[in-house]
Design a protein with these regions (language model features):
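Sec-dependent signal peptide recognition
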Residues: 2-12
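Immediate N-terminus of the mature polypeptide
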Residues: 2-3, 19-212, 216-359
Length: 359
């Protein structure tokens, strides 16, 4: 899932300092060098971030039934001029309320009724029999599944169709117990691991999209794996969510050497990154990285030159949100030959950033 799909709120601070032992007439050269180094710093930070973080995409699909055409001219049918979708009520709830059809409460899923007209082969009033009712149920059920309500069911309860009203009943599927089974060699998971990851609690409406988001949060660190199993609960309409979780060794050290630098401050770049997965057992990530340039003969630069970059990063997901904190410090120096003497350019850039995004 793209990590920041809806909105992002952030604080960003850049503090660049550039120094040069040269006349002010060379300020354009100074600005050019500084711009090159700022670009190089941004590229280095982006490369490290992409290497150390991941944005897992989890997609779970519910089983839909094939859609059928609405039958015409059924042998046994009832004239229906009103179609109503209502939520299921237990017997005690029914007995405590009036039995008049006028008091039927529309379902919270009434928007799904639009699906019965999608094929344009059905309109009210209509003569509807058992086959037609099954087609209507299937269309509404598939619509609910499309929106993630994979355990919500649509049924027909006993009723008198001579009234001209057909009432379809929705049995909302709710979340039962949420369990996390830690299968790691050394248990890493805590209550916070699950609570920070899952954007739902027991008793909420079960929507597969929330489960997908929870799995993505659990798998946000590279050393963690997670899978889910839905199982019937003892309570009517509830489904237990059982998550299998496994985390490997949480510490990583990455060394690198490439030629991504500039000729002015050194093409050859060496880097070292240390990362720690699940620092607070909240699916969070921390890393620190350092990069510096090394001299080589093909740089086409004379005198003293070089660059260094140190960056810190921390991220923590919380249900449907992601908080990231980052900072970096970049320094460089370069000697440029003048007409009579050489000049030394040096610069320093510091960045601090905080961002809160909705996933």
């Amino acid at each position: 899932m793209s990590i920041s799909r809806v909105f992002g709120v952030g604080l960003f601070l850049i503090s660049p300092f550039v120094f040069a032992e040269l006349p002010s007439t060379n300020s354009s050269v100074e600005r050019k060098i500084d711009a090159q180094q700022q670009k190089q710093q941004a590229e280095q930070d982006a490369a490290i971030l992409a290497q150390q973080t991941q944005s897992p995409h989890v997609r779970l699909e519910g089983e839909k039934e094939a859609s059928l055409s609405f039958p015409q001219n059924e042998a046994q049918c009832f004239p229906i001029n009103q179609l109503v979708l209502t939520d299921y009520q237990a017997e005690e709830e029914k007995n405590s309320s009036a039995s008049s059809l006028k008091l039927i409460q529309p379902s919270q899923f009434s928007w799904a009724l639009k699906s019965v007209y999608a094929e344009r082969d059905f309109a009210l009033p209509a003569c509807i029999g058992s086959e037609g009712i099954n087609v209507l149920l299937r269309r509404i059920q598939n619509r609910l599944i499309d929106f993630g309500y994979v355990t919500t069911r649509v049924v027909v309860e006993p009723q008198d169709l001579r009234s001209g009203m057909l009432v379809l009943t929705v049995i909302p599927g709710k979340v039962g117990r949420i369990q996390l089974q830690d299968q790691s060699a050394i248990p890493f998971a805590t209550r916070g691991t699950l609570w920070f990851a899952m954007p739902m609690t027991q008793g909420d409406m079960l929507n597969i999209r929330n489960i997908e988001q929870g799995l993505e949060n659990l798998k946000r660190v590279s050393s963690a794996e997670a899978d889910v199993q839905l199982s019937p609960s003892e309570a009517i309409g509830e489904t237990d969510v059982v998550i299998s979780y496994k985390q490997r060794f949480p510490f990583h050290l990455t060394l690198g050497l490439d030629d991504s630098g500039s000729k002015a401050t050194g093409r050859l770049q060496g880097s070292a990154t240390f990362s720690w997965d699940n620092v607070l057992t909240l699916n969070d990530l921390f890393y620190i990285s350092g990069t510096r340039s090394f001299k080589r003969g093909s740089d086409n630069a004379e005198g003293d030159y070089g660059s260094k970059n140190v960056s810190l990063y921390y991220s923590i997901p919380w249900k449907n949100y992601l908080l990231t904190l980052s900072g970096s410090k970049y320094t460089y120096h370069q000697t440029v030959a003048g007409g009579l003497e050489s000049y030394t350019y040096s610069g320093e850039s510091q960045q601090m950033k905080a961002n809160l995004s909705r996933l």
